[in-house]
């Protein structure tokens, strides 16, 4: 991709914008890696096509917050015969003998505050797709997320008073190895009272102490903060193996990005490992990305 940038004489700041804000790369590795130009151009086209379709932004965000996404999954799952269970604890994962493949689970469904043992049940299966929290012995820590949730009473400066924004501060502009992400939503999304805004600043930890300093460039970009909440670093887990030996296929943890691009890559990866083929979305033409071209 460096040759493409050089051909058009693009400045460093323009390259940062294209690579990190449009193509959504988390690092600058794509610039010098061979064969990445096509992938980068497809990502840029997806961004441009999305802008053409939605107008103000290439992104769509659910009303009432991200909790609507699992609700949408639950409804779609039910249409295809799936069962979505809340307040359910996995008691045991069963395998066909030592070193065998997964064969089922034992679990207990119990509402919070409910007396008694709850509803115990057992179900058979041939594959399990799960996040790292269910199999702590099958994952490793590959990094840590730093995150601050801030309450504002004003829109972020120099964003045209937008009621929602995503800002990406490229790593090279703040002397870091990882980008800093800012996602802001407001009462327009029914997530807070009118006149208030919720901004989340996140990045990958690069030091073992003074984590608030790593988020400082993002926090400064917000302006005056009414209230700030920042917890301990959040571990990022990745599976130790593919899962083909025991048919337990694990996802990665969420990273610091605010646009879910890496999450969609993880979905494709876990599908490839579990099914042995690439994920093909029905009704989507090859090479079209996730947005139809006009």
Regions found by a protein language model. Give the residues of each.
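Short amphipathic alpha-helical segments embedded in low-complexity Lys/Glu-rich regions
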Residues: 19-24, 91-95, 167, 234-235, ...
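C-terminal catalytic lobe of FAD-dependent flavoproteins
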Residues: 197, 207-294
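General structural feature for long, well-ordered alpha-helical segments within catalytic domains
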Residues: 1-4, 14, 36, 40-43, ...
């Amino acid at each position: 991709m460096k040759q493409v940038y050089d051909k058009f004489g693009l400045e460093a700041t323009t390259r940062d914008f294209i690579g990190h804000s449009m193509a959504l790369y988390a690092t600058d590795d794509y610039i010098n890696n061979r064969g990445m130009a096509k992938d980068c151009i497809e990502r840029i086209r997806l961004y441009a096509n999305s802008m053409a379709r939605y107008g103000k932004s290439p992104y769509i965000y659910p009303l009432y917050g991200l909790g609507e996404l699992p609700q949408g999954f639950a409804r779609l799952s039910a249409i295809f015969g799936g069962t979505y269970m809340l307040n359910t604890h996995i008691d045991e994962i069963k395998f066909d003998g030592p070193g065998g493949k997964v064969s089922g689970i034992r679990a207990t469904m119990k509402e919070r505050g409910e007396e008694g043992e709850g509803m115990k049940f057992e179900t058979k299966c041939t594959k399990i797709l799960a996040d790292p929290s269910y199999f702590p012995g099958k994952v490793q820590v590959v990094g840590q997320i730093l995150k601050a949730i801030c309450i504002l009473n004003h829109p972020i400066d120099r964003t045209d008073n937008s009621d929602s924004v995503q800002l990406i501060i490229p790593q090279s502009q703040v002397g870091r190895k990882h980008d800093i992400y800012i996602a802001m939503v407001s009462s327009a999304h029914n997530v807070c009272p009118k006149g208030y805004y919720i901004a989340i600043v996140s990045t990958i930890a690069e030091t073992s102490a003074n984590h608030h300093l790593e988020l400082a460039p993002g926090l400064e970009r917000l302006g005056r903060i009414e209230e700030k909440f920042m917890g301990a670093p959040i571990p990022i887990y990745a599976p130790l193996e593919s899962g083909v030996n025991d048919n337990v296929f694990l996802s990665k943890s969420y990273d610091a990005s605010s646009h879910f691009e890496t999450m969609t890559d993880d979905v494709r990866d876990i599908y490839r490992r579990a099914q042995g083929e690439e994920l093909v979305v029905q009704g989507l033409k090859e090479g079209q990305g996730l947005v139809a071209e006009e």
